């Protein structure tokens, strides 16, 4: 359980990227109005893949809308709750 979205982001990132799977990454990436919470560039099956992540503890409806908007610019768009 996390009290803040920042705690959620930090804990997620520590566990997600423990093996340095992301070639590059940026928090608060300006790919759309309002910024995506996290964008990663990764190699997946010998192909470069762009992923976006939205972190939400509340307002899941907003997270879905943000992830849908992000999906226009990335290969996969994820919601972390």
Predicted regions located by residue number:
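A short acidic, amphipathic alpha-helical/loop segment
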Residues: 64-69
């Amino acid at each position: 359980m996390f009290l803040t979205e920042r705690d959620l982001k930090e804990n997620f990132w520590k566990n997600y990227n423990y093996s340095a799977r992301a070639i590059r990454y940026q928090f608060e990436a300006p790919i759309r109005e309002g910024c995506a919470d996290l964008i990663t560039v990764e190699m997946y099956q010998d192909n470069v893949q762009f992923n976006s992540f939205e972190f939400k503890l509340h307002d899941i409806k907003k997270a879905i809308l943000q992830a849908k908007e992000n999906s226009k610019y990335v290969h996969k768009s994820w919601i972390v709750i």
